Regions:
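Extracytoplasmic
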Residues: 36-38, 56-58, 77-79, 154-158
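Extracellular/lumenal and peripheral-membrane lipid-interaction modules
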Residues: 28-32, 50, 62, 154-156, ...
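Soluble extracytoplasmic domains of inner/organellar membrane proteins
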Residues: 101-192
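Aromatic-capped interface at the extracytoplasmic side
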Residues: 21-41
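Structured domain cores in non-transmembrane regions
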Residues: 64-119
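A mature extracytoplasmic/lumenal domain signature
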Residues: 45, 55, 63, 86-88, ...
Length: 192
């Protein structure tokens, strides 16, 4: 009888943990989206689409490097904290990069060192939000629209990212202030 009670209690505890872990992950992301500071990261052109990558737009950012003094202090793939500010147009700018998590209320995000320039003068950053997943029926059209607007210098294309306490969530990809999903939807309706 006692062993059945212990098994029942253990089962309940395991079930609660299995519910708690994904619920906490969802709540943490919802908090970043609802109360995190929004940044606009200007997007740079990338290579043509890779058909093996799946249903997302691969993003590359203009603001992805920072000047460094000593390349020996940095290693490819290591976690870094990117302190951010915004320029006069409201786009994200890297203020500095640190190996230590900032303690004060500065705007920062956790990222990785992508690589260090051959001459050691720049550190390139790999952001955790370099893929924008889309509904399967719209992904291909979105990729075409995205690539077309990047070639047109009169178009302003950027990623809208919410950031709070180092965590970041890619909210949307915008073209001239309009979500890419809406542009693709409109283009698909116009073709009908």
């Amino acid at each position: 009888m006692v062993s059945k009670k212990i098994i029942l209690i253990a089962f309940i505890l395991v079930a609660l943990v299995q519910i708690y872990v994904p619920a906490k992950m969802i709540v943490d992301r919802a908090i970043v989206l609802s109360s995190g500071k929004e940044f606009k990261f200007k997007i740079a052109p990338i290579d043509p689409t890779d058909p093996f990558r799946g249903k997302y737009i691969s993003l590359n950012f203009n603001e992805n490097s920072v000047a460094i003094q000593n390349k020996g202090n940095w290693e490819n793939g290591e976690t870094v904290f990117v302190l951010l500010t915004t320029d006069s147009n409201g786009f994200a700018k890297i203020r500095s990069v640190s190996k230590v998590r900032p303690l004060d209320s500065q705007d920062f995000l956790k990222a990785k060192v992508n690589y260090i320039a051959y001459d050691g003068s720049k550190l390139f950053i790999e952001y955790p939000f370099d893929r924008f997943y889309m509904e399967e029926s719209k992904a291909y059209d979105a990729e075409l629209t995205y690539n077309r607007t990047l070639r047109d210098t009169s178009q302003v294309t950027y990623a809208l990212v919410n950031i709070k306490n180092g965590e970041s969530i890619l909210k949307d990809v915008m073209i001239n202030g309009i979500p890419i999903k809406e542009i693709v939807k409109q283009e698909q309706q116009n073709r009908k």
